[in-house]
Amino acid sequence: ALVTAGSVGQAAAWGFVAHRIVAENAAAAAPPGMVSFYKAANERISAASIEPDSVLKARDQEREKRRHYIDLDELSRPPFRDLPFDEDKARALYGDERVDAAGTLPWRIMTVLGQLRDAFRKKDWEKVVVRSGWLSHYVADAYQPLHTTKNFDGQESCNEGVHAAFETDMIDIGRTAYRASTALPASFTPEVIREPRRFIFAQIIASYDLVDEVLQADTAALAAVKKQRNDYYEEMERRVGVLARQQMSRATATTLNLWYTAWFEAGRPQLPETVPPPAVRADTP
């Protein structure tokens, strides 16, 4: 990839633009019973969606960074049938050091999902807003292929810099088109995810299957630039733009499904039609 100031390591995620698009598109598609609250809270949920990359990483450092990825190939081999989905079982099998090094993304999603469900039960609307944003962030990370592999920045395949090029630069350049093309259709109806941990792992494994396509696109785009045929980002967009849109759209659908799941499991409480003003928060991890 073209190595720029934005090129980053595994601690990074989709860029702020992509995370905001996922959160905002999910809120805009909320179903009856949730729609008024989520539309009113859209801007604040969008702001919360980037807090894991800003506020939480600044506060929690390495502990937060490892919550944004899971290098499946550090723990097992495709198709990962022997990989425990239960965190305690994974730690018993591999040890804490190895699990922490590989990343804890799927279990972080489960933790925040539980926090959101509890916030709905307690009618803590401020926490519902914040955890909705956080959950959208981690869910989106699960759909970024380079968040699932130890070769997260192409450093093992001569694709250094591909991480930021794919998830941030390419999308920032085409942000308007990405926002429109990844919105959920009006016909979309959210569903309760009955086994969220199993579902989340399935999505992450599916994301891993796309890693080679992203790396190959970077290699081809660099070759095209060297031959002065095209701009690097134009080539990346042509080769993996559809893939990026597909993953962002899937992240949006899963985000809304998990919001709906948390609300449903909390007893479908009546949500206010307005959003409380931001509170001074002392959020726990």
Predicted region positions:
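Short alpha-helix carrying the canonical HExxH Zn2+-binding catalytic motif
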Residues: V128-S136, A140-A142
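N-terminal, motif-rich segments that launch catalysis or mediate targeting to/interaction with membranes
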Residues: S7-V130, P145-P285
